[in-house]
Amino acid sequence: MKYDYVIVGAGSAGAILATRLSENPDINVLLLEAGPDYNGIEDLPEEVKYGYKSTTSIWDSEHNWQYKATSIAGNTIDIPRGKVTGGSSAINGTIFLRGIEEDYDDWAEAGNDKWGFQDLMPYFNKIETDKTYEDNPGDFHGSNGPIICVRYPEDTWLPGSRAFTDAALDAGFPFCEDANAPDTTGVGPLPLNSPDGIRWSTAIGYLGLSRHRLNLTIRANVLIKRVLFDTTGDTPRATGVIAVSDGEEFTVEGDEIILTAGAIGTPQLLMLSGVGPQAHLEEFGIECIKDVPGVGQNLADHPLTQVTWKTKPTVELDPVGPRLQVLLRYTAEGSEIENDMIVYMQHAASRARELGDSFIDPIGISAGLGLNLALSKGELKLGSADYRDPPVLNYNMLDDQEDMRRYRDGIRMLVSLENHPSMKEIIENRPYLLDSDLESDEALESWIKKNVGTGHHISCTAKMGPATDPMAVTDQYGKVHGLEGLRLADASVMPECVRANINVTVMVIGERIADFIKQGH
């Protein structure tokens, strides 16, 4: 059967595109997902259903692609990505945070004039039901969207949240009541898409609205070998995909092919299909359909590591209780980039992996330091021409000295907060970052290189931009330059990573490009 739209990847954006495009009953949509699909909340495995109220680990789950990457100094880090309907929104930390106004206005200034903050504001509101502002949403919040957003009221904050906030306020950071309002900075409650601890993914919020439709077909456990092209005309046109289901190959045709496989899957699939840097494709014997140098380049993420404190025996630690309640956004001293630093205060910290993993024996609390708008960029390359093999990810993390300077200063700022009376009241010691690691810039850099990981916000690997930008892969409507019938709509098209967790922004990309398609762009 031939479909109007074949969407590859049922993740944060793909599930939204499928839901919005299938609102027209005259259009047939096929949504393909590499991982499994679950019909409802009650069917979800524990590690997918619950954000942190889980005793099982998402890290080693079949619902995680379990990628590896080189971070810095040859170190290997884990890169979890969702392999299930809902994509990474179904396995992430449920932080429902918008970028700041300038993030999106910068996209517009880079030649994507329909992506400014004011253009996107209706979509931020459209995707959400913000329980905090439900009765009075105003101009900056939604009260009728598919994704439920909550915050922990101050009177429910755990000791670590309270102590960290007190210390940050006394250090001069302002209080931020609403981190999703435009141009906010400071310390305050963290917005989360986890009502009652349930990870409210796009599979729940969006596919829950659309999976009954007869014009939407959802097929799970399907891998894609490559996109097919008709090259008989002047401009190659995407006509379908070769899909593998239970070991059997199928050719699926569509009037338009939309790749929403994420910032790793989408550029990998493009290159396997002959769309990417020509010399790199030829290394693996792949016929080049279109030489697009920007595919896999410009890789961005947020370097992140934890400063952990062992708490006193009197402080109760619940490994399946609230893990995240407050955050701090601030501008590094001497930085020209506003809000270039972010801190997530975490409860039930341990030696174990932190994000999404509650199968731990907690020892205390921690502050996760993230660097926004890193100047260092990474790249994604093929590891082989086999669609079953993972790509090679080199994050090139903190390679720029200004990145390292800002990060060093951020670690020292967090350490300084431990001297506040509220922090001293609950912490016993700092077990993993020793005083000797702080004695010099060189010692601290060495510690950072051994410990830094990622906030799991990989993006920008097939960025959108005007055709005059040699590294732009798509135009601002998501259409791949120099090809017909092929569109991208996920974190890969971001021109620059936002100063926030990216899940909200990726959902907005799904909504925005769905509207572009409906409008005939």
State the predicted function of each range.
Residues 1-521:
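N-terminal redox-cofactor-binding region of secreted/periplasmic oxidoreductases
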